[in-house]
Design a protein with these regions (language model features):
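C-terminal catalytic region of ATP-dependent kinase domains
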Residues: 115-185
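Catalytic-loop signature of eukaryotic-like protein kinases
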Residues: 106-114
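A short beta-to-alpha transition loop/helix N-cap that caps and shapes the active-site region
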Residues: 12, 22, 130-134
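ATP-dependent phospho-/nucleotidyl transfer catalytic cores
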Residues: 13-101, 113-114, 142-154, 179
């Protein structure tokens, strides 16, 4: 809460800009190798070509145009985790559940072009976590159809749905959720 000379000015939060400079400074990577994608297709830094390839590995459209999860068998999961940091995605989802931000449309992902850092979700924009509406946060993230935004477009949850289709990751997620809530939250 911000008060200036005793007058209430509202609720503000300070946060760093989650851009390639931030990622380079905090993760020790070369900023010229950073790709940042938002809403599954929009390039904020670098290219989205690899992210689109990774998305198509887990979710494809059927004949009627609906998104369908392509299950990640053990072999496919091993390949998928060469590109996506599955443990980081689990931690991201746990944080989103704990800080129940109903605004899941503003998603960002990043990686380095040399894969020293695999695709990870960026946790930011948690302003709606202060609202009283909790909703079914994980239900939204595991919705293969997507979640409609205010402009009518769908925010795709492809990576999360693909990971959930794998038994090894699902077991890891549950175990990690219990551990994090017991020891950290």
């Amino acid at each position: 809460a911000v008060y200036i000379n005793g007058r209430y000015w509202g609720l503000y939060d300070l946060k760093e800009n989650m851009n390639k400079d931030y990622l380079a400074a905090h993760y020790g990577v070369d900023e010229d190798t950073v790709n940042i994608i938002k809403r599954n297709t929009v390039e904020l830094a670098g290219s989205n070509a690899d992210f689109l390839r990774v998305r198509s590995y887990v979710v494809q459209q059927n004949a009627s145009g609906a998104n369908v999860v392509v299950p990640l068998t053990a072999e496919r999961y091993a390949e998928f985790t060469k590109w996506v940091d599955a443990e980081s995605i689990a931690d991201y989802l746990i944080a989103r559940e704990y800080f129940p931000d109903a605004d899941m449309f503003n998603q960002k992902y990043w990686r380095t072009t040399d894969y020293k850092v695999r695709w990870r979700a960026i946790f930011y924009d948690s302003d709606f976590a202060l609202s009283s509406e909790r909703g079914d946060v994980l239900g939204h993230y595991f919705n293969v159809v997507g979640v409609p935004s205010a402009d009518g477009s769908l925010s795709q949850m492809d990576l999360y749905c693909g990971l959930r289709s794998n038994e090894e990751w699902s077991d890891y997620f549950i175990t990690r959720y219990i551990y994090v809530t017991k020891y950290y939250l």
